[in-house]
């Protein structure tokens, strides 16, 4: 009996020694949790933990694009126009006579304020022919706008509104763009259609640079265009294309699309071109026309053979106006223009594009071939009065 009792005691001691570290460790853990204001029950997720996790997710959603959109958004405006068009109306039911009567057409576009004085950039095609222009800001304020000037060839217009505490955007540098970098297109295409006056935002990248297009039927020449896959449509035409810093790098202008919807090929006028036109329009109310004083024509095989030219690249000077800048700088009929301001000239289209960005006061460096020898002539761009 005593022997069995001793054995039982020994077994209990062994069991105690085996399980004591585990019990001690659990008690230590409990004491540590208690010292931190926690308990085993609170190790499960609490409501506050969920809120903290939600805050982290929310903060992680903020990035360079959302920041850029917030910076530029207040300066983006809706441009609402009324254009009057004369339409024919039958004078009587049984007679083939018609009267021309005015008919108002409402148009919608976008724009961006670029100065605290209330100057706005938009496309010329948005406001051309408008009899009434109303601008709506993102804070719902509405202003009647005045056209300061239109640069039709570059499809740029400057408007002016009068108001206090106007938001405005900063210009970037379109000569410092990188293919593949983020591009953000904004516009306010809804105007009076919806109550919300906030602009729409679409995101893409700079797809290509320096896209040139020949003069279209409206007399517009698009040069050095910025191509982007950020969605551009008729409503955000005139709105800004911005970089990740919220700086304007272009003005949304048109898309390539048979259906009219965005298919990832949109084009914006580079902001450096816009700045040049805007300064001219604000100072003079128009784009001053340049007097060159010479005309050119395409080369053909007959001309090339007669002048012993090795190729058909270049344009032939076929007329020089007396006492013109061209005449004063020594340009002559029969000269072959092969370069203008560093741009290779192969035909008259190249020549038109090369001079489209030139303003009064600029110097024009013209590379020519005369009697087979290369020469350079510097022509001063003066206003055509």
Predicted feature descriptions by range:
Residues 1-42, 67, 146, 178, ...:
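C-terminal recognition in membrane/secretory proteostasis and scaffolding
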Residues 4, 49, 53, 130-133, ...:
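Active-site loop architecture of trypsin-fold serine endopeptidases
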Residues 28-120, 128-134, 141-142, 214-227, ...:
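Glycine-biased strand-turn-strand hairpin within the trypsin-fold
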Residues 82, 125, 188-189, 254, ...:
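Short, surface-exposed secondary-structure boundary micro-motifs
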Residues 87-104, 148-154, 194-199, 209-226, ...:
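Gly/Ser-enriched beta-turn/beta-hairpin loop segments
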Residues 103-111, 169-173, 226-242, 318-328:
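Gly/Ser-rich catalytic serine loop of serine hydrolases
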Residues 106-108, 113-195, 313, 345-346, ...:
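Conserved active-site neighborhood of the chymotrypsin/trypsin-like protease fold
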Residues 112-114, 125-127, 146-149, 207, ...:
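Conserved positions in beta-strands of structured domains
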């Amino acid at each position: 009996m005593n022997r069995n009792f001793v054995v039982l005691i020994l077994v209990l001691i062994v069991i105690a020694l085996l399980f004591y570290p585990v019990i001690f460790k659990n008690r230590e853990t409990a004491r540590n949790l208690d010292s931190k204001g926690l308990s085993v029950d609170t190790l499960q997720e609490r409501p506050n933990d969920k809120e903290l996790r939600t805050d982290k997710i929310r903060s992680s959603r903020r990035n360079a694009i959302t920041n850029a959109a917030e910076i530029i958004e207040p300066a983006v405006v809706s441009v609402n126009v009324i254009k009057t068009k004369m339409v024919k109306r039958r004078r009587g039911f049984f007679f083939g006579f018609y009267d021309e009567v005015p008919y108002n057409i409402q148009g919608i576009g976008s724009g961006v304020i670029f100065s605290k004085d209330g100057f706005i950039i938009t496309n010329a095609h948005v406001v051309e022919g408008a009899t009434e222009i109303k601008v709506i800001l993102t804070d719902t304020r509405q202003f009647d706008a005045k056209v300061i000037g239109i640069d039709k060839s570059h499809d740029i217009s400057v408007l002016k509104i009068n108001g206090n505490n106007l938001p405005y955007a900063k210009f970037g540098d379109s000569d410092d763009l990188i293919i593949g970098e983020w591009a953000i297109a904004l516009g306010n295409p809804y105007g009076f259609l919806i109550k919300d006056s906030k602009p729409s935002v679409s995101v893409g990248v700079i797809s290509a640079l320096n896209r040139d297009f020949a003069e279209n039927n409206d007399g517009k020449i698009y040069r050095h265009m910025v191509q982007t896959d950020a969605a551009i449509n008729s409503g955000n035409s005139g709105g800004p294309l911005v970089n990740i810093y919220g700086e304007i790098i272009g003005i949304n202008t048109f898309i390539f699309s048979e259906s009219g919807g965005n298919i990832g090929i949109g084009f914006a006028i580079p902001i450096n071109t816009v700045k040049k036109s805007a300064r001219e329009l604000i100072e003079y109310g128009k784009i001053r026309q340049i007097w060159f004083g010479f005309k050119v024509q395409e080369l053909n095989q007959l001309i090339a053979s007669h002048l012993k030219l090795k190729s058909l690249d270049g344009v032939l000077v076929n007329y020089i106006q007396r006492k013109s800048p061209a005449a004063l700088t020594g340009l002559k009929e029969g000269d072959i223009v092969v370069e203008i301001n560093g741009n290779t000239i192969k035909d008259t289209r190249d020549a038109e594009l090369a001079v489209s960005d030139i303003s009064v006061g600029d110097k024009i460096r013209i590379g020519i071939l005369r009697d087979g020898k290369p020469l350079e002539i510097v022509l001063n761009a003066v206003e055509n009065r």
